[in-house]
């Protein structure tokens, strides 16, 4: 060993060898100090949770061996448990901590006495209020005769515990209903002005208008043309017609539509009313976005303008199918040349693959105008 060391000293020089030994010693000292202060971590390569194991000792900790063949022994590190806050050590907090335990102990003793009395087939001594409550909760004679003793053993204590909860049940139910109503108002912002039903999107509301209120109007017109032997019970609608009275919801809708149509025309930026070549001309407002335009700017005939004012007319940006209520696939929409309603080519009956040549009229205009419809005039 000594010969090897002397050979290394002669080869590299004594100063270089001494510096190398010093650097090695300092590196080992730094590594040992770093390991002793290293925090626990998860090794990403091995997946092992590495933590300080306290096996790194100093030279001053060495002691003589305690067993045969042992050269050194080191003192065992004491296991230290972290102290936690114990509120029972404070004498001022002890009464507050003992109060719930006494209450639970008292309730447990009371329940134990009741159960013991039930097991002994002796009626428990209860206040009159609890006796009246139990009499009201007894099943009628026609019910199935279950084991009454077992039912009382299982249900007697929960009934007494839930007795105080009945006072606040009404307030909680009212609060839940109010929260549900507010949530519905937020989830369904589109409201029908006629019946008050709410929808999540505008196409659903338009579908509701078309298939509910428009269908009711068509049914009333057909009933007037073909009177039935019995009288309908819609006396309030006939009463409104006789008095020339409009419901409040419809008046609000009409007033809102009138306010929206007071703006300028989106095409000519003119006023709400202007003198056209055909005479006095009023703008038509979209029922969804409120944008308006003159019939001549929209290239409407007099019949189309009159028909557009008879229902919830929509502009080209808001137009959706009058049958399915959807605004998707707008390239498949057909527009009626009499009322300007939109229909998908696959929604009409019979469905068509290509738009028809010339003018086209929807089934509503064909039913109402008959031989005066634009499609009928084109065919003739």
Swiss-Prot record:
Note down the stretches annotated as region Disordered. Answer: 132-164
What the entry lists under InterPro entries is as follows: DPF1-3_N, Znf_C2H2_sf, Znf_C2H2_type, Znf_FYVE_PHD, Znf_PHD, Znf_PHD-finger, Znf_RING/FYVE/PHD
Annotated positions binding Zn(2+) 3 = 321, 324, 344, 347
Gene3D superfamilies annotated for this entry?
Answer: Classic Zinc Finger (3.30.160.60), Zinc/RING finger domain, C3HC4 (zinc finger) (3.30.40.10)
- SUPFAM superfamilies given in the database record: beta-beta-alpha zinc fingers, FYVE/PHD zinc finger
Zinc finger regions, C2H2-type: 190-213
Q: Which annotated residues bind Zn(2+) 4?
A: 318, 336, 339, 362, 365
Zinc finger spans (PHD-type) are: 262-321, 318-368
- Give me any GO biological process, just one: nervous system development
Binding-site positions, Zn(2+) 2? 286, 289, 315
Q: Where does Zn(2+) 1 bind?
A: 265, 268, 294, 297
Report which superkingdom the organism of origin falls in. Eukaryota
MF GO annotations? zinc ion binding
Which keywords does the record carry?
A: Cytoplasm, Metal-binding, Neurogenesis, Nucleus, Repeat, Transcription, Transcription regulation, Zinc, Zinc-finger
Work out whether the entry's keyword set contains Cytoplasm. Answer: yes
One GO cellular component assignment for this chain's record is: nBAF complex
User: Which compartments does it reside in?
Assistant: Cytoplasm; Nucleus
For this chain, the family text in UniProt reads: Belongs to the requiem/DPF family.
Function recorded in the entry: May have an important role in developing neurons by participating in regulation of cell survival, possibly as a neurospecific transcription factor. Belongs to the neuron-specific chromatin remodeling complex (nBAF complex) and plays a role in neural development.
State whether it acts alone or in a complex, and with which partners, per the record. Answer: Component of neuron-specific chromatin remodeling complex (nBAF complex), a subfamily of ATP-dependent SWI/SNF chromatin remodeling complexes.
Task: Give the protein's recorded name.
Answer: Zinc finger protein neuro-d4
Species of origin reads Gallus gallus
Q: Which gene encodes it?
A: DPF1
């Amino acid at each position: 060993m000594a010969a090897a060391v002397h050979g290394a000293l002669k080869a590299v020089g004594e100063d270089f060898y001494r510096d190398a030994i010093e650097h090695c010693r300092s590196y080992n000292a730094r590594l040992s100090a770093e390991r002793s202060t290293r925090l626990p971590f998860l090794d990403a390569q091995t997946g092992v949770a590495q933590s300080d194991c306290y096996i790194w000792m100093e030279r001053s900790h060495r002691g003589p061996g305690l067993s045969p063949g042992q050269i050194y022994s080191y003192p065992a590190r004491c296991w230290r448990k972290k102290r936690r806050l114990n509120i029972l050590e404070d004498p001022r907090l002890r009464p507050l901590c003992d109060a719930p335990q006494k209450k639970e102990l008292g309730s447990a003793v009371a329940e134990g006495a009741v159960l013991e009395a039930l097991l002994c087939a002796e009626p428990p001594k209860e206040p009159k209020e609890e006796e009246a409550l139990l009499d009201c909760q007894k099943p009628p004679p026609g019910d199935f005769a279950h084991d009454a003793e077992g039912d009382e053993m299982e249900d007697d204590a929960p009934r007494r515990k839930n007795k105080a909860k009945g006072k606040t049940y009404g307030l909680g139910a009212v609060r839940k209903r109010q929260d549900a109503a507010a949530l519905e108002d937020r989830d369904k912002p589109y409201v029908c002005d006629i019946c008050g039903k709410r929808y999540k999107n505008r196409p659903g509301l338009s579908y509701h208008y078309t298939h509910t209120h428009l269908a009711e109007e068509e049914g009333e017109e057909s009933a007037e043309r073909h009177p039935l032997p019995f009288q309908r019970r819609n006396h309030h609608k006939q009463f409104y017609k006789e008095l020339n009275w409009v419901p409040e919801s419809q008046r609000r809708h009409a007033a809102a539509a009138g306010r929206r149509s007071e703006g300028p025309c989106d095409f000519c930026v003119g006023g709400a009313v202007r003198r056209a070549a055909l005479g006095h001309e009023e703008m038509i407002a979209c029922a969804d976005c409120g944008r308006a335009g003159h019939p001549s700017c929209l290239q409407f005939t007099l019949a189309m303008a009159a028909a557009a004012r008879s229902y919830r007319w929509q502009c080209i940006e808001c137009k959706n199918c009058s049958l399915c209520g959807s605004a998707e696939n707008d390239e498949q929409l057909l527009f009626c040349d009499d009322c300007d309603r939109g229909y998908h080519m696959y929604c009409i009956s019979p469905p068509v693959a290509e738009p028809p040549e010339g003018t086209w009229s929807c089934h509503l205009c064909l039913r109402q105008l008959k031989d005066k419809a634009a499609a009928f005039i084109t065919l003739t």
